[in-house]
């Protein structure tokens, strides 16, 4: 499973993921000036899951009824891997099949909520 870490999360997230067995890169390594639609297209073409704290990606998936890329939204006041990283990793591992097929996961400190793509109104 390949994870692309959005600019609104620290590059430490990519390192944190790699330490736990995920192929992971930070957006700064592939070009940070991309618009959201271009970023989603880039991730989908390369089979990356997008890890972000930006809720706009979920809204874009809903508006376009898109199936790819899968998006994992981190919803927490504390965005450091040390604060919520293990919860995010657990959600990724638990939902691996769904993420391959297309899913939106919202993760907070207490739970992860999974929605299968495309999102229904």
Where are these regions (language model features)?
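Mid-chain, well-packed structural core segment of small domains
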Residues: 58-92
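Charged phosphate-binding loop/patch that engages nucleotide di/tri-phosphates or the phosphate backbone
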Residues: 95-121
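Glycine-rich nucleotide phosphate-binding loop and flanking beta-alpha elements
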Residues: 11, 57-59, 113
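Short secondary-structure boundary segments
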Residues: 7, 53-55, 76
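Short, flexible helix/strand-to-coil boundary loops that buttress conserved ligand/catalytic motifs
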Residues: 17, 61, 118
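N-terminal first-folded block
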Residues: 2-49
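Acidic, metal-binding active-site segment of PIN/NYN-like and related structure-specific nucleases
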Residues: 44-61
